[in-house]
Each structure stands twice: as C-alpha cells, then as structure tokens.
Amino acid sequence: MGKHDRSNDTQSVDIYSSAKRKKKAAKKGKKNKRSKTQKIIITILSVLVGFCILVSGLLIFALNYFDYNKTDLDEDLLGAQLDDSEDHVKNIALFGIDTRNQESMTGLSDSIMIMSIDSKAKTIKLVSIMRDSVVRVNGKVNKINSAYSTGGHERAIKTLNENFVLDITDYATVNFSGMIGLIDMVGGVEAEVTKNEFYRATAYGSLNDLIKEQAKLMGLKNPELVDAPGKQMLTGIQAVAWSRIRMQATAEGERDDYGRTARQRHVLKELFSRAANMSVTKYPKFIKKLLPYVETSLSYKEIIKLAPAIKGGTLESERIPYENTLIKGHTGVSAGLYYNLDYASELIKGFIYDGKTFETYVAENPIDKTPWIE
C-alpha cells in the first residue's frame, strides 16, 4: 500500500470518527433538551399539584372551622330523571332568596338557576329559569317559584327535574342580600348603569333610593351612593340594589323580570370572575363571609372536589324561556310565561352536555310552540 493510500485510509477514519462524535453530540444535545423539557414539565406539574393541595387544604380548614348551613336531602323525593348524564358533569340547583333580610332562607325563590360544573372541560354553565315560568308543580299548573315556598328545596328540585328532565340531586340557596359583603371583598363588580336605571329605578324612586332602603335594613347610616349613570365599579350594596331593578331596561334592552334576572346573572358572573382570580390565601376569609348566607346539601368533600373547576374554569350563561319561544294561550296562571317544556329541556341539555349555545341549538332545531296545557 502506498503512502497516498494510507493517507486516504487515515482521512476516512477521521471522517468516520468525526461523524460518530457529531452523532453522539447530537444525541446528547437531544437528551439534554428532553431532560430540560421534562424538568420544566415536572416543575410545572409540581407547582400545579402543590397549588391544588394548598387550595384543598384551605377549603378543608375553612369548611371544618367555620359553621355552614348543611342540609340533607331525601333523593327519593327529588325525581331525578336523566339517564344519559355524565359523571364529570355535576348539576346543582341554585335558589336566590331576595328577602332584604340577610339571615333569612325562606320565602319565594326570587331567582332560580341550574349551575352545571364540568370538571373535565373546566366550565361552569348557568341557566336561569324565569320565576314566572308556567310548569307543573306537584301535579298542578303553577309558576315555578311557588315550588320553593310551598314545598321547600326538595319540591323545588323535583319541579326542575320533572319539568326539564334533569338529574339534580343537590342545591344551594343563597340570600342575595348576603352577597353585599362578598362583592366588597373582591373589590366590587363592573356594570353599566343606564340613565333610566339611575333616575327611575322604580315607580317610587331612583337607584340611590333603593340603596338607601337596603342600607336602612342593614342599619347603615351613610351608604355610598352612585354618582352618575354609565359604566362603573359598583360596591356590594350598589350592585345588589341595581340587580333588583325591574321597571327599566338594561343597557342590552332587556326589561321587566328578564332585565332583573339579566342583572343578577351579570353580578354573579362578575363576582365569580373576580373570586376565581383572587389570591388563594384570601379563600378562608371569603368562605367565612359566604357561608352564613348559603344553605346547601353539598358536603365539604363535594365542595372541595368541585373547587378546581371553579378556580380555573370559565362561566357561560343562558336563560329560559329563550326569545321567541313563548306560546300564546290560556294557562289559568296570571302573568305566567308559557312555553313548550320539552323544547326547553332540549335547549338546556344541549347547552350543558353538547356545549351548544341556545342560539346555535335553535338554528339547528326549529322552535316548538306546541301547547301542553289542555
């Protein structure tokens, strides 16, 4: 073999060795990148797990340390009917009692909502049921809000389940006056106060007159009043007074009871959004403030299980009856809202389980106005 051939062989070995080294270096680089990525993922997961443990710990502490109005339900009396319900979706009946007395949990349910918590999708959906809705209550045609006053939370839940084919087995009753302190804790809620709402909130006076009325019931001498109409931050007492307005239209044009429930949903959505972004360390104080004004069948373990979805979830809302679904006809119920209950049931289930807004569902399925009262 000549000198030139040996040189070529040496060069080939060098090229091979160099390629091998580069390949090893590339593998090492990829390994290091994977290692760094894995470390980042592990770190993030550790933080999230730690956060969840911290939140759960604070909730356990708060719910054990502070008394709350826990009640037990007889599930045989609730009429739960939905066979195709999903394990990761929890439906809860929410009843709002607007008595002006912050400590009362009795009376007509001024607002009725179905709160659906999807722990998998991390969504919370609210469906408001108008209190003047004509339904069957204990076998008789009546307004839906009569169920709570005549048979308590069990009859009210049964009425929702039987008329809208649902699987509700838990509830929470909230005294809306008790929301005042919670709203103040989160720094208030943003709302747009129209000129009519500001100057002529009721037949008897302005929004500030409503605020003064609420303050008098609470023993407050100098409540903070609203200075002018427009978009602004409302304090707790201002927001609760604003949510009670029925006479005037909202900024979106909704009137009467439609407007009132729209304001209530807005206040609840704002409160939820601000509470969800609140520092975890403030949770015990927030819960302590909330619990005296809530009566619920949920145990503290169930509340803790739902907490992650509430903390990181998004909130969407709809209202029953949906626009243009009312039926003209005699119901025997004065000033009742008469609509097809089967169609309303499908609207609700499409929203909760399929993620379809009412607008989307109606576009795909023509409105059914078939009367059901003979």
Spans of model-derived segments:
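Entry/capping segment at the start of metal-dependent catalytic domains
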Residues: 2-6, 11-14, 27-122, 244-245, ...
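C-terminal solvent-exposed extensions
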Residues: 82, 102, 133-142, 281, ...
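Extracytoplasmic
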Residues: 87-90, 107-112, 121-129, 139, ...
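Structured segments of extracytoplasmic/periplasmic soluble domains
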Residues: 95, 101, 132, 159-167, ...
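Second-shell loop/turn segments in exported
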Residues: 101-104, 142-150, 165-170, 229-230, ...
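Flexible, polar/acidic helix-loop-strand segments at domain edges
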Residues: 105, 184-279
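Extracytoplasmic/secreted envelope proteins and their assembly/folding machinery
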Residues: 109-111, 141, 153-161, 176-180, ...
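Amphipathic, coiled-coil-like alpha-helical scaffolding segments used for oligomerization/assembly
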Residues: 150-218, 297-299, 318
